[in-house]
Amino acid sequence: MTLTADTLLAGPRGRRLCLEVLRLAPDGPEARDAAWAVSWAAQALDENPGTVVAIAGDASSFTEPEVSPAEAAAALARVAIPELTDALLFTALSLAVDHAAYWQPPSGEDVLAATEDLQPVLERVAAAVAGAPGTSWWGSGVERDTQAMVRWENSPASMEAPEELSARWRSEQVEEEVSFARQIDDVRLSGSWWSTPAFALPRSTRVRGTAGPVGLTLVEDSWGWTSARVRPLAAPDGEVIEIDGPEAWAALCRRHPFPVTASRRNVWGRTTGREGMWMQPDWAAVAGEAAGVHLSVSGYLATAGRVVGLGDLGASTVAGWGPDETFWFSPVEQSAPEQEWVRDGDTWNRV
């Protein structure tokens, strides 16, 4: 899927990226006013807004400002789109990814970004982002020649064959569905929220210059890791299924449907507001027809966290993936010595 303004505005993560671009504008009166307006407008829309704490003074006299989405939109409209450097775009992308959470209601910022009031403001940002040189690779397929796998904090790599991992994934998913089905009426019950293949499968992202693999930074709800081992991979031969948008995801779910209503109904219901049947791909079946499956950046921005309709099969969503991530169903070979990387602030550096 080619990255377009419509692509960005179609999905929750794409809209959040556009909002983050404006929030990264250089400091100034307009940027400060917009930051203030967005903060309070989002606070009012958040189902879990938290508590305002007064550090000094009389807290009892404080009244939270009431800022409407229309007022926040007006403040954002006065902010000039910042220079869309590669660094700024990647920072906005990483922020949009890090704030993804599919086991709870959407954040106030995500709700705000989906309002009609903000659409004209985000449209101009989306058009600029889609036309920026730094996003030219966001719609591309898997880049086989520069793949690398990330292992956080020296976590061990799985020694099982990918075929065994996929087969066990299916049996564990069946057991999980049966278990949750016994408690189907408990609306408080949480559950698995991801829709990925088996986590222990080899998975990788492309390497971009000296910054290393994008998988070091583009991590949903990251745990604040400060060290990682990076293993360059030789991508296996064979077809790689491309998920470049909701249509591709829907086609995969229809071709290999796996029901997950019992385990996902509460978590995906909270994050999307939808009730009904849920499906995801049967990854064990998908593994029988391809060497891997790749989620492009534009596919992620348009699809992650979005309700993807499947007709009589219900609906699905992409959750738990990273942009540009490939899960490999075939064995992979290490192509170069493993590297140690450490994080200094927001920057990863090779040791």
Q: Can you name each region flagged by the protein language model?
A:
Residues 1-192, 227-351:
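Active-site and NAD+-binding cores of ADP-ribose-processing enzymes
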Residues 178, 184-186, 191-215:
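N-terminal/edge-of-domain interface segments
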